[in-house]
Amino acid sequence: MTIQAITESLSTARFSTYQLPILGGASPEQCLGIYLWNKQLASAFLPALQIIEISLRNAIYQSWIAHEEEQVELNFQPHDWVTEKAKIDKLWFVNTFTRQNNFIAWSNIQTAVKQLNYENKPLTAENFISKLTLGFWVSLVQKDFDVQKNSYLTLWPHLRHRVFPNAVDSTSGSPLSINSIGNELKDINKIRNRLSHHEPLWRNKKAYQVEDIINKVIEHYERCLKVIYWINPSNLKLLDIIESNTRMSDLCSLHALWKNKQLPAGIPTLQVRKDWSKGVKINPEHTGEIINITAANVLIKSDKNQAIFYGADRAMQGGINTFALNDKVRFTPEASSAKYPNAKNIMKL
């Protein structure tokens, strides 16, 4: 009953995508194990995708600004640089697109505007950059924005060396075309969307055996590493630090798939855990000494960091009249915009 309840809650139709003969999902338990394997792959994939998204959008934006500043220095006298650079449109990627020239990009921007307004955030370049999707930035990496197209926005090839300094042909050493780079990014965006919609990462119509499925996942991840290198090789070190590459290596194996297929068999014997955080949460309390007391509040010096905390009468167990100067107390700290942080739930020791 437990396995059936899980598969029904995950959607029978969606679950059927894991019932591939090639993966050996002969039973509901094994199919659930394949689902769990995909969940772990998605989790290991996420840091690489996040690095690509953040580094790509920042590289495109900053490269455009740097190019415009460079043009100012080439075309104006030094005493005019500050004035002319101030005229550079910091929202160039927002103001460029209209309903007429690029409806999809314009629609993405309108969605970002609505989100920022809803969150009561200013419409700054930084906030727009964080709200626009990976797909928006990927759509800029194509020959439509090449100088030869003479379109409403020109990005390439003059920004290529800034955005993708290491995107070169491994044989000739010559820079890769923007279309070649863009095609790789489009494939990565498809993987990101597949992951966000909880779909299998291994789709491969030409797969004959399970090894082909696993190799497809490896190819997807390798593509991510390649693009990260193109933009900034140093970011690859981040994946090593958090052991993402190690996790992917462990998961992309026949043994990992087999192991996950066995896991659900023991589910019926497991207890449902409803108190996970118990024993995990870290005690945030401080101890300290009351160093000043009035009719309405106290000041407490923390033993932990020697900071001074403000405690109101309403935060004191039993009321302020039950406390005295130099009393030892326990309290929960809380940040405040006032002179002192707050002390909450104040109790005598």
Spans of features found by a protein language model:
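Amphipathic alpha-helical interface elements
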Residues: 1-265
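Structural detector for short beta-strands of small beta-barrel domains
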Residues: 272-295
